[in-house]
Amino acid sequence: MDTSTSAYAPLPGEDPLFSGHPPASLRRSWKGFAVIFASVLFLLSLVGLIIHQGPQQPPDVMPDKQDEHHHPQSTTPASETTASWEPRGKALGVSAKSNPPVSDELSYNWTNAMFSWQRTAFHFQPERNWMNDPNGPLFYKGWYHLFYQYNPDSAIWGNITWGHAVSTDLIHWLYLPIAMVADQWYDANGVWSGSATLLPDGQIVMLYTGDTVDAVQVVCLAHPANLSDPLLLDWVKYSGNPVLTPPPGILTTDFRDPTTAWTGPDGKWRITIGSKVNTTGISFVYHTEDFKTYNMSKGVLHAVPGTGMWECIDFYPVAINGSKGVETSVNNPSVKHVLKASLDNTKVDHYALGTYFEENETWVPDNPGLDVGIGLRYDYGRYYASKTFYDQNKERRILRGWINETDTESDDLAKGWASVQTIPRTVLFDNKTGTNLIQWPVEEIEELRLNNTDFSDVLVEAGTVVELDIGTATQLDILVEFELEPLESSETVNSSVGCGGGAVDRGTFGPFGILVIADETLTELTPIYFNLANSTEGDVITYFCADERRSSKAPDVFKQVYGSEVPVLDGEKHFARVLRALRKEVGR
C-alpha cells in the first residue's frame, strides 16, 4: 500500500493557504476501511483516492443556500435552475434530454478516442443513436427483456420506436430487432413509453402511449405474435387501438405512460396513467377485464398541487419485512405501496411510501411532508423515467432508469450515440428507518469482478489525500467504509448544511470520501463524499454528495454539486459503493 499523501489541489481561485494541512490545533483524523474490486474490461489508468478536508472554508466558497422549496432530503447548487431547462421534444410533451443552457460559444475539441472510452461497460446502451425511457421490462422463458425509447436514425430525440434487448443475467445484453415502430395513425408521431403485464394464463399485455397524427396522446395495446418464442421478437398491435383517449378536461398532450396492471378484489385489472390539471400532478385509475375496454374510477389515485405533469408513473407494493420483492397485485397489511412520478417540469423522479385503499382506489402517503414531488427521490444525479418490474425468477423487484449525459447535442451527434440505462437495482423497504426505500445493484454485477484489491486500516489525517495503488483499471466496483473518531464532549459538527458548498466546504468532520476519474495532478477529478452537519435539534445529519465541478475540463459540459441526506443509524458506519464505469454512487 502506498502511504504517501498529497494536498488536495485547490479549485481555481481558491486560497492556496487552505489547500494543505490545517493548523495543528484543528487537525483531526478518521479511519477509512476501503475494499476496492476492479473489473478490467479495457486498459485505462485510473488512480483511486480517499480524501478528507480540514475544517477551514475558503473565503470564496459560499455557504449552502436553501430556497423556499428546499426539503431536508435533497440539496442542489444555487446555480441550478431546473425551471429554465428546455428538453428536446418539449412541444410534444415527452421526456427528452434536458440540460441547463450552456453557452453556444463554449466548445471542446473532442476526439474519437475521447468519445470511445466514454462508452460504458456496466451499463446498457444501444450500439448507436438516441435512447431514453426504459419500457415494458419483464422476465419470460429464461430471458430478461428490456424495451426502450429509441431513435434508429439519429443520436438526438425523434422518430421514437421501441428498441429491444434481452439478457440472461441483466448484465450481458443481446440486441434484437426493433419491437415496434411508428406505423399507424394512432402512433404516427411516436411509440412512446409503456408497461408490460404478465397474465395468469401466460398471456403478455403491453400497453404503451401512442402520439397520433394530430399529436394526441392515447393508450394503445400490443401483444406478442408468438408466445412460444422466448425472445418475443414480433409484436402485434391491437386492431381496435387506441384503447384509451384523454378524458374531458385533460389536454391532449397530458395523458401518457400506462403502468403495469394489478388486480382488485373484484378480479378486474387496474392501471394508472399520469396527467395534470393546471399545475396539479395527478394519476388516473382505470378498470378493465380484457385490456380493450376501460372504465375510469370516479376519483384519482393521488394528486399533489404544484408538481406539474406526472409521467412515467410507477405503482407497486413493497414488503414491510423480509428481503424479497412482492408481486404487483399484492395488497395486505404486510406491505406498503410506492407511488412514483417523473416530474416533467424538473426532470426528477420522486417517490413516496403510503397505503393503497382498494375500497375507494386512493393512495395516501405515510408522511404528507414527503409526498410525491416534495420529498424523496430515487436518485439525485442524472436519472429519469424509471420503471420497476417484479422478477418472478428470483422473487425481487428490479428498478431501472434513464441517464442522459450533460454534454451538448452537437457532442451527441459527433459521438453517434446518447444516453445509457442505469445498473438494475433491487428495491426493498427500509424497515430500520421505516421512511424510505433501499436500492442496491443486482447481485449479478458481482460476476464482472475479475480482481480484488483490499485496503484496510487506512489512517487518513485531515487535509490529506491518500493514494491507493490499484494498478491499471477502467471499470471499478468500489466499496468503502469509514469509521470516524468520536466527537469529544466539547465539540460539535459545524459544517454547512447539505452538499451545496461542494467538496471544499469544510467542517469538523468532512467532507470525507473518495476521488474518482482523477488525473495525476488532481486538477480533473470527481469527489464522492460524505458531509456532516448539525440539525436544529442538535443531532448530526449525514449527507452523501457528488461534486462534478472539476469532473471534466470541457467547458461545454454542465457540472453541478448534488446529493441528499442519508440515514446513518446509531452504531452504523459510513458506507459507500461507487460503480466506476459511468460513476454511479450508493451511500448509507
UniProtKB/Swiss-Prot annotation:
GO terms for biological process: carbohydrate metabolic process. It catalyses: Hydrolysis of terminal non-reducing beta-D-fructofuranoside residues in beta-D-fructofuranosides. Disulfide bonds join C499-C545. Gene3D superfamilies: Exo-inulinase, domain 1, Glycosyl hydrolase domain, family 43. Pfam families: Glyco_hydro_32N, INV_N. Residues 57-86 are annotated as: Disordered. This is Acid beta-fructofuranosidase 1, vacuolar. It comes from Rosa hybrid cultivar.
